[in-house]
Amino acid sequence: GHESAIELLDKYNDVDVTVYEAGDFISFMSCGMQLYLENKVTAEDDVRNFAPEDVEKKGGHVYANHEVTAIHPENKTVTVKDLTNNSEEEVQYDRLILSSGVTPKVLPVPGNDLKNIYLMRGRDWASKLMSAANDPAIKNVAIVGAGYIGTEASEVFAKAGKHVTLMDMIDRPLGTYLNSELLDVLEPTFKKNMDLKMGVKIEGFNGNGKVESVKTDQGDVPADLVVVSAGVMPNTDWLKGVVDLDQRGWIKTDPYLRTNVKDVYAIGDAILPLSIPAGKPMPIALATTTRREAQYVVDHIFEDKPDRAFKGVIGASALSVFDYHFATAGLNQFSAAKNKLDYQTSFYEDNMRPAYVPEADNPKVYVSLTFNPYTHQILG
């Protein structure tokens, strides 16, 4: 949303731009939370790309604690609720850009309302997690979900001296993000720093007011704190009946990122952008993807018919796991198979520098390539 506002104000001289944010903080980057929790970024307010004044100094308006609750296409208005006093007003628009984002999933199991069951998304949770990492009373930490967020959380608490158990339904940490050869490289590091319980089903949480253990189909896991990172769902319930959604709640857009409602566009984590290697829309919840979408929409927002469609994205991201640093682009074994594509992989290992350089200054480099064996298209 902020990227759209900045781009609009930079590109056009005669636009009135207003940003509404339901939360009390603008543009918190959850992907940077690990840096804050490890004290590499000293202030939680610094974990963001934009501040309200970045928009305001260009002539725009930013309202935090203001939730857009409804769209009225026939009048080209939205209902805005001021969450500080519960007052509402109708606001006119000529063009509307939706960037409503996603909400972390809460596991629908008994005990999910116990204290000390945390999520890892947003500024408020960052503060709670920082307190927990420094709390000597919290000794056993269970992380539910072994994707990017879960592995980041497991590293934070392991470095804080906690006994960490990382668990997931999948058979290996990061199993949906990296090819198997890279997982082979990483797995010993995970096992050295924490307990792994892979291929387990979470059946509930046990405790008396506060969580004491995680109930799984393979036994209970002691936990003074549980961090749940079990995926996300689009924040789109408020759009039902007005904006077309798919069966899972993602906003449907055409190739120009327009919704079914005239002059209403959608960008960000709540849509399914075109994946170039997959050749179809798929979830790619990355800030870089959203920024490309925002730039495209702003470039064409006043055209009756854009002269080109949104070209799509590859989906590139990076992750550090203890002493390893990974970057990925496109599809891997898991996502290629999920999209029913023909694929093979190739793995290469070498040192960064010539062999005569001492080992301490000559780290290993690992490359895993996913490709279509028939067309030779590189998938990721």
Model-derived features: where do they sit?
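Glycine/serine-rich phosphate-binding loop and adjoining beta1-alpha1 elements at the start
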Residues: 73-74, 87-128, 132-134, 139
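Beta1-alpha1 glycine-rich phosphate/pyrophosphate-binding loop at the start
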Residues: 1-63, 148, 155-178
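FAD-site-proximal beta/loop scaffold in flavoenzymes
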Residues: 113-137, 206-215, 220-299
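Mid-to-C-terminal Rossmann-like scaffold of FAD/NAD(P)H-dependent oxidoreductases
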Residues: 270-380
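A Rossmann-like FAD-binding core segment of flavoenzymes
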Residues: 14-16, 56-84, 90-91, 159-253, ...
